[in-house]
């Protein structure tokens, strides 16, 4: 039996998670996965119930699970809370508690939504990128850090640091991912300037010897940012550190022009969390307008990475493609003046497109 912890969160979170749960339940029943799903609170919903964005019971639930599904957290309702108690802190603490060190973000162009991209169709038509970002090190967590005043002048400082074990474990994740794709991996660094990323390049090159079937290349981060716009289809797997990955994964997500379609996975040793990359969209919460496809595709990633159910992951992804082929659209991905369907209807359409009666 596999245990799944489900945190719907805030805003549109409960709606999109409910739609994704429909798909997961249908797959579970058809594939006899034996899943046990348990719901918990995180973010603003947890604040409302317990005055804590991540109650101890929620963290325990997540740590006992084989995988976590998250909807979205945050919203203006909780803006007045002090920073340490904001809904987003619940998400950060959850990631830290689970020791999630690898973030996987696909950026795939759906041919049915080609016109949604801000770039010309010929540039993005074949884009299918996976950004693998290290989550626990780098300048975001390095010490020392702080603000100080010296001789009457304010000074801020941060420390960029990685050790070789941190680099090696994220590199293995990226190379394994590349083996299941087009077998190309581009490691992004700034090795011409930063000693930290010089070590990064050395260790990634060492790890590459374990994966002779994967073609490794290296690229400086400034060039990578340019190439993502100039010729994005050249990339398969992009591997990079925390700060560079933070920036490049957001850039890559915009290539698609449809943030409501993009899932993500955060992986640790034996634990993982799956969530859409979009926010809680409180302006449309409770109106059956949200696009659940990113969350449904996050379920597909969970089937692939945590449940050893690759054929079913592919089947969910194919069902999403089939729904788009049928012309079904939520408001965020619909062309002006075309019909739209709601969150519930889109979830039901994906379940139907699984063709489980075949």
Curated annotation (Swiss-Prot):
Q: Which residues bind NAD(+)?
A: 75-88, 279-291
GO terms for MF: 3-isopropylmalate dehydrogenase activity; magnesium ion binding; NAD binding
The note on cofactor binding and number reads: Binds 1 Mg(2+) or Mn(2+) ion per subunit.
Q: Which GO terms describe its cellular component?
A: cytosol
Name the UniProt key words of this record, in alphabetical order. Amino-acid biosynthesis, Branched-chain amino acid biosynthesis, Cytoplasm, Leucine biosynthesis, Magnesium, Metal-binding, NAD, Oxidoreductase
| Main location (coarse class) | cytoplasm
Family matches, as PROSITE patterns: IDH_IMDH (PS00470)
Which PANTHER family does the entry link to?
Answer: 3-ISOPROPYLMALATE DEHYDROGENASE
Q: How does it assemble?
A: Homodimer.
This chain's protein is named 3-isopropylmalate dehydrogenase
